[in-house]
C-alpha cells in the first residue's frame, strides 16, 4: 500500500515537473520572439524639428563669425591693390622727373590767354598730371594721340580728344571706391554742362596742392608762387631738390573716391568744376569747387576758407566735413597716400591735424619723423 502510494506521488511529481518545465520553455521562447520583433522592427531616419533648429542655429552662428573675417580679408586685398596703383603712379612720376628733369605740372594752363576763366584765370590746354604721365605708364599711344601736340590752343577740349579723355584706366581707379567708375559730363560751377557735354574719364587719385585751395585765393593770381606750397599746382615744375622737407615725409598723391565728388585723370577744363555726388550733396559745407579741383586737392589751412569761416580749417583724410577738395577714401579708417620717395602708407583719419598740414607742404621747415604719422 505504501509502495503504491509512493508510485502515485512520484508520478504526480513527474507530471508537475514536466508542466513547469514546459511553461518555462514557452516563456523563454516568447521572450526570444519578443526580442526578435523589437530587433527587426523597421526604423525611420531623419531630423526631428528640434534637431533641425539646432543645426540652423549653429550654421547661423558660424556665418556670423566668418562673414566679417571674409569681408575684412577682401577689403585688405582691395587696399593693397589701391596701394599698388599709387606705387605705379609714383614710379611714373620719378620716370618723368628723370627724363624731363622735373615732376609733371599739376596741370598746364596758358594764363595769358584772353579767353581764360575770369574766376580762376584757367585756360587751355588744361593737361593734367595724369595725362602727362601717360608715356611712363605704358600708354604712349595716349600721349602721342593727344591733340595738344597738334593744336595747343584747345588741349583737353579739342574735339579730336573726345574719345581719348573719356577713357578709363584701372590704375586710376581704387577697387574700394563705392562711387561711379564711368566717365562723367564736366559742368560749370552752377551745374550746367560744358563744351557740348564733353565727358572725361574718372580718377580716384589726386595730387597734393599743399595748404591753399588749388584754384587760388581772392583775387586769383596768374603766378601761384606766393600761395602754392605743395608739390603740384597750376604750371608747377618742382624737382627732387625742391622738396627740402624730405621726400619720405611729403605727400604727393592720395585718394579721392568718386562717391564724394568728380575727379579726372586727363586734366582741367577751364570754367568747369568738381561737383559733389548725391551721397554728399546735401551735407553742410559741401559744394562744387573750381576746375583745378578736378585733379588737385589741398590740406588747409587756406586763406579763402579762413576768410569764409573766421578760423583755420584742416582737411585730414576722410574728414567728416567731406570737402570736395580734400583726400577721401572708402577704406575704413583712413586713406592711402604716396610720398615723394614713392613709398605708400595708410594714413589714419585721426591723424594729428598739424602733422597733416606739415606733410602736405614741400618746404615749410617742419621736421616730421616717419613715426609721427
Predicted regions and their residues:
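General helical secondary-structure elements
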Residues: 15-19, 24, 33, 40, ...
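Surface-exposed loop/linker segments characteristic of extracytoplasmic
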Residues: 2, 65, 76-373
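A ubiquitous, low-specificity "background" feature that marks scattered single residues
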Residues: 24, 28-32, 39, 57, ...
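Detector for intrinsically disordered, low-structure N-terminal pre-sequences
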Residues: 19, 30, 37, 69, ...
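N-terminal leader/signal peptides at the extreme start of proteins
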Residues: 1-49, 111-114
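Generic alpha-helix initiation/capping and coil-helix boundary signal
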Residues: 23-27, 66, 284
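N-terminal single-pass transmembrane signal-anchor helix
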Residues: 43-78, 88
